Structures are given as structure tokens and as C-alpha cells.
């Protein structure tokens, strides 16, 4: 009686590969279908985002035009301080509208809005000057009282400057400015402690230029801030309603809060930043970023006045115009290590 063999015939390697290929077909098809669905979803989301941005842009244009017309009418017919304060309040609303719209507005529309706002702010300042009572002419003798006017008055809770200061002459116009004269600031100073208070800074354009080994404290809410040709300086500034410009600086430490930060031709500088849009660097090296940590009495009030959203901070969202590679980090800037962020500001 012959025995029946139960052993299976040997399987050739070619047959195994064929079976493996067959088993992978459904998986490949499934993956391809998933990728197709993801692409469809991405396109759908992109269309929705474009529609939302378009609607937001239309809303911005209509709201801005309406509020601008209201402010212009208030300024044209303003015959009292109350009317001017209403115009100032509406301008703060316009500033907040611009700040909230910076992510979806085209660069041209954003620039047009900022320039229109700057013109309205200048017109408001002019109307305030016109409505101020005329001072009667009288001869005055210069004495101790006049000399003492150059000293910095210390605000409650804020340490005074080490030495009294006097505003140094400033250029009437800075190259590449935003179309308005620089109204206050410091220039051509070395190894000094310099301060300005909220009453001096409110919605004004500040220029700091050619400073060396200086500490500058700006307690308040400027409109714009420009720091140029500074070396080994420490700059502490309250919330800036629009932009901060930094150019030709080295070995500095800054604490600034703003809508946008632009840095040009600067090296070896640490920046403690609060920014609602983003920072832009160009022709720079050795720039380090960390979150904004400076504080002082009344800073909450200044943030409210500036129109900046304090809960929004893109301090580490930096564009380097000299580094276009998306898959590699720029060598020109970096995040300041946490162990190096403990700075005694005052």
C-alpha cells in the first residue's frame, strides 16, 4: 500500500513575489484614494480661505472708509476739545482695525491704510494746537526754575534716570520715513540714561539715532519708533501702535512691542519682542529673539491705547529677506536660549 505524501510542493521565489504584489494592490489603491481626498479637501479649504479673505477685505475697506469720513468731518468742524477727543477715540478704533486685518490685507492696502491713518493723526495734532489758548506775551527772567525744567520727573513706581537729560537736536526729516516729521527722540549721545514719559510719547513718531552705550526707556505709546546707528545700547519701549524700524545697529538689547518690526544692516543684537504680525530682517547677522518681558506701571493702559492685541505674539515668526531656503533655518537669526533671557531691565 502506497503512502500518500502530505508535504506541500516547494513554492518558487517568483510565485512569492507575485503573491506579495497582489496583496499590496489594495493598500496602494487605498493610499492613492486617501491622497486624492486630502488634495480635494486642501483645495476646498483654500477656496474657503480665499472667500473669507475677500469678505474680510471688503469689510475692512467699507469700515475704514466710513470711519475715516467720520473722523475727517469731526476734525473739520471741531470747535471743542470734546469733539477732538471723539476723533481721537475713532482713530484708536481705526488703528485696531488695521492691526486686526494685517494678516489678510494685501501689502498695498495695508500701506494705504497706515498712511491714511498717519495723515489723520497729524491732522488731529494740528487741530489740537489750533484750539489751544494763545499764551499772552510777557518777559520772563531765567533762574533756577527755568534750569530745573530739563530734569526728568519721575512717575510713581518708576525709577528716575541716573542723570537729568535734555532733548538733543533731531533732524527735521529722516530718509525713508513714513511721510511725517519726527517729533521727539534723542541723538548724538554717549553713556547716558535717557527717558521719555507717556505724555511726551503718545501717538508720536520717535527717532533715536547715533547713540552709544546709552540706556533708553520710553514709558508710553508711540506711533512709530526708529533706532539707527546705535552701538551697545539698551532700549526699553512700551507698545508702539504701528512699526519699529532698526537700522545700522550693533551689540544692542531691545524690548519692544509693536505691530511690525523691520531690521536692516544690524548685527549681534538681542530683541525681546511682542509683535502682532511678524519681524523682518535683511542684511543682518547674529540677531536673537525672545518674548517681550519688560513691564512698568500703566503698561496695560498703554497697550489698550496702542490698539495692539496683547494676547497675540509672533515673536518667533521671522522673515529673512536674504535667506529664501524653506527647508533650512536662516543662519542670520535664532531663538535666544531660555537660560539667557533673565535680564534685569531696571
From Swiss-Prot:
GO terms for molecular function: GTPase activity; tubulin binding. Residues 28-54 have a biased composition (Basic and acidic residues). PROSITE patterns: C_CAP_COFACTOR_C. Disulfide bonds: none annotated. Residues 171-323 form the C-CAP/cofactor C-like domain. Pfam families: TBCC, TBCC_N. InterPro entries: C-CAP_CF_C-like, CAP/MinC_C, CARP_motif, TBCC, TBCC_N, TBCC_N_sf, Tubulin-bd_cofactor_C_dom. Keywords: Acetylation, Chaperone, Cytoplasm, Phosphoprotein. Signal peptide: none annotated. Its main location: cytoplasm. GO terms for biological process: post-chaperonin tubulin folding pathway; tubulin complex assembly. The modification N-acetylmethionine is found at residue 1. It is found in: Cytoplasm. Residues 1-54 are annotated as: Disordered. GO terms for cellular component: cytoplasm; photoreceptor connecting cilium. The modification Phosphoserine is found at residues 80, 168. Tubulin-folding protein; involved in the final step of the tubulin folding pathway. PANTHER family: TUBULIN FOLDING COFACTOR C (PTHR15139), TUBULIN-SPECIFIC CHAPERONE C (PTHR15139:SF0). Belongs to the TBCC family. Supercomplex made of cofactors A to E. Cofactors A and D function by capturing and stabilizing tubulin in a quasi-native conformation. Cofactor E binds to the cofactor D-tubulin complex; interaction with cofactor C then causes the release of tubulin polypeptides that are committed to the native state. This is Tubulin-specific chaperone C.
